[in-house]
From Swiss-Prot:
PANTHER family reported in the protein's UniProt record: MITOCHONDRIAL IMPORT RECEPTOR SUBUNIT TOM34, RNA (RNA) POLYMERASE II ASSOCIATED PROTEIN HOMOLOG
One Gene Ontology MF term: heat shock protein binding
Keywords: Chaperone, Cytoplasm, Isopeptide bond, Membrane, Mitochondrion, Mitochondrion outer membrane, Phosphoprotein, Repeat, TPR repeat, Ubl conjugation
Name of this chain's protein: Mitochondrial import receptor subunit TOM34
SUPFAM superfamilies: TPR-like (SSF48452)
Function: Plays a role in the import of cytosolically synthesized preproteins into mitochondria. Binds the mature portion of precursor proteins. Interacts with cellular components, and possesses weak ATPase activity. May be a chaperone-like protein that helps to keep newly synthesized precursors in an unfolded import compatible state.
Membrane topology: Peripheral membrane protein
Residue(s) of cross-link: Glycyl lysine isopeptide (Lys-Gly) (interchain with G-Cter in SUMO2): K197
Pfam family for this entry, one: TPR_1
Gene giving rise to this polypeptide: TOMM34
Phosphoserine carried by residues: S8, S160, S186
SMART domains cross-referenced by the UniProt entry: TPR
Phylogenetic lineage: Eukaryota, Metazoa, Chordata, Craniata, Vertebrata
Basic and acidic residues bias locations: 164-178
TPR repeats: 9-42, 51-84, 86-118, 193-226, 227-260, 262-294
Length: 309
């Protein structure tokens, strides 16, 4: 007796998933297509299921190098369930492969509004930023399409999904890729980094800390060997009450320069705001070993001391 050929949406999707895992992308694509036709013929409204099928078929197109059909299917998936992470990432990858860097940047950036821990989006943004700076120059941000504002409901939907979805795509965003960390900047990169850092400094003077963060981030993409750039970005994070980010940047700054007084002071401030008084006190103590007469540090030490007891 011949094996039963799958005919329900669930069976077709499961068969498609199996073919995809086995590297049979054309077969998987056909199975997802059949599942879509069956679902649509039923006339029942199940946008989540339909969106997943479009997104899965898009993954097949991407594997086969068919970027235009990948973009088309991802767009269909997103029309059904806006701000879904997988189709956004797949469409971004397809745009990137077609060298449509502004469109790829927008999709990666949209993903990071939903979940800023998605490593592939962090890495994608870094690649697109470098590509756009090279192709469009320092004013590249002005030439981008508008980036949609992600509603809170979309963020909540993602956070409510099973943890497997997050594990599949998310790692700590503080871990830069090995390629970026190990890349030795050229003299041109170092100069570009210096100019961008100065632009960030000017924005700080004007009180525009959000824009300054963008400039410092671009600077660090060109060269991540400048301790002051990390500690300057940390200041912006402090002002914006993003204390965990400030701690991370100060730590990076101190890895590069163990006597960076500003990094010690700003990390102490961030630790204090996070109510980690022990770490704050340790940072102030280290700072005062370098600069015993630092007035602001002495004052901060007194404030932290009161909270330690």
């Amino acid at each position: 007796m011949a094996p039963k050929f799958p005919d329900s949406v669930e069976e077709l999707r499961a068969a498609g998933n199996e073919s995809f895992r086995n590297g049979q992308y054309a077969e998987a694509s056909a199975l997802y297509g059949r599942a879509l036709r069956v679902l649509q013929a039923q006339g029942s409204s199940d946008p989540e299921e339909e969106s997943v099928l479009y997104s899965n078929r898009a993954a097949c197109h991407l594997k086969d190098g068919n970027c235009r059909d990948c973009i088309k299917d991802c767009t269909s998936a997103l029309a059904l369930v806006p701000f879904s992470i997988k189709p956004l990432l797949r469409r971004a990858s397809a745009y990137e492969a077609l060298e449509k860097y502004p469109m790829a940047y927008v999709d990666y950036k949209t993903v990071l509004q939903i979940d800023d821990n998605v490593t592939s989006a962090v890495e994608g943004i870094n690649r697109m930023t470098r590509a756009l700076m090279d192709s469009l120059g320092p004013e590249w941000r002005l030439k981008l399409p508008s980036i949609p504002l992600v509603p809170v409901s979309a963020q909540k939907r993602w956070n409510s999904l099973p943890s497997e979805n997050h594990k599949e795509m998310a790692k700590s965003k503080s871990k830069e890729t090995t390629a970026t960390k190990n890349r030795v900047p050229s003299a041109g990169d170092v100069e570009k980094a210096r100019v961008l850092k100065e632009e960030g400094n000017e924005l700080v003077k004007k009180g525009n800390h959000k824009k300054a963060i963008e400039k410092y981030s671009e600077s660090l993409l060109c060269s991540n060997l400048e301790s002051a750039t990390y500690s300057n970005r940390a200041l912006c994070y402090l002002v914006l009450k993003q204390y965990t980010e400030a701690v991370k940047d100060c730590t990076e700054a101190l890895k590069l320069d163990g006597k960076n007084v500003k990094a010690f002071y700003r990390r102490a401030q961030a630790h204090k705001a996070l109510k980690d008084y022990k770490s704050s006190f340790a940072d102030i103590s280290n700072l005062l070993q370098i600069e015993p007469r630092n007035g602001p540090a002495q004052k901060l030490r007194q404030e932290v001391k009161q909270n330690l007891h």
